[in-house]
Amino acid sequence: MSKAAIAEKEKFVDAFAEELKAAKAILVINYLGLTVEEVTNMRKELRDNDVKMKVIKNTYLRRAAAKAGIEGLDDTFVGPTAVIYTDNADDITEPARIVSKYEDDFDVIEIKGGMLEGKLTSKDEIKELASIPGREGVLSMLVSVLQAPIRDFAYAVKAVAESKDEDSAE
């Protein structure tokens, strides 16, 4: 292999290591068995939610993870591997939610493991995380809870006003 090709690959590994270092959530999956259309749809949904998906040789993944200071994921870099990651600190549950949905829809996807905010995470923890509502969901629940007492008070005032109108009409 030429020195230029080796330098190019090292440059790629270094760039990917920087992306992994900045990532708040990293998921490692086996995607073998998905059609091109299914992978394309999953990538689009991930991209729409500020999440990236890359399919990279396992050797490069190991090197990039080592350069990024990520330990414990080496055993997941076996077989067909895709890395799904985001640097969006606002919602680290989004990658887990999307991948979990696709895993439920297509039996061929397998979550191998991951890392969330620097902590090694198992497949079961990722599935559990996927069931937690995202930032927008939590905010809408909070707004609903805050509005409930005001709404109930408004209904009570309206009911009292209507009953007084009925009493005065009689």
Swiss-Prot record:
One of its GO terms (biological process) is translation. It holds the Pfam family Ribosomal_L10. GO terms for molecular function: large ribosomal subunit rRNA binding; structural constituent of ribosome. SUPFAM superfamilies: Ribosomal protein L10-like. Transmembrane segments: none annotated. GO terms for cellular component: large ribosomal subunit. The keyword RNA-binding applies. The keyword Electron transport does not apply. Keywords: Ribonucleoprotein, Ribosomal protein, RNA-binding, rRNA-binding. InterPro entries: Ribosomal_uL10, Ribosomal_uL10-like_sf, Ribosomal_uL10_bac, Ribosomal_uL10_bac_type, Ribosomal_uL10_CS_bac. PROSITE patterns: RIBOSOMAL_L10. PANTHER family: 39S RIBOSOMAL PROTEIN L10, MITOCHONDRIAL (PTHR11560). Forms part of the ribosomal stalk, playing a central role in the interaction of the ribosome with GTP-bound translation factors. Part of the ribosomal stalk of the 50S ribosomal subunit. The N-terminus interacts with L11 and the large rRNA to form the base of the stalk. The C-terminus forms an elongated spine to which L12 dimers bind in a sequential fashion forming a multimeric L10(L12)X complex. Belongs to the universal ribosomal protein uL10 family. This is Large ribosomal subunit protein uL10. The lineage of its organism: Bacteria, Bacillati, Bacillota, Bacilli, Lactobacillales.
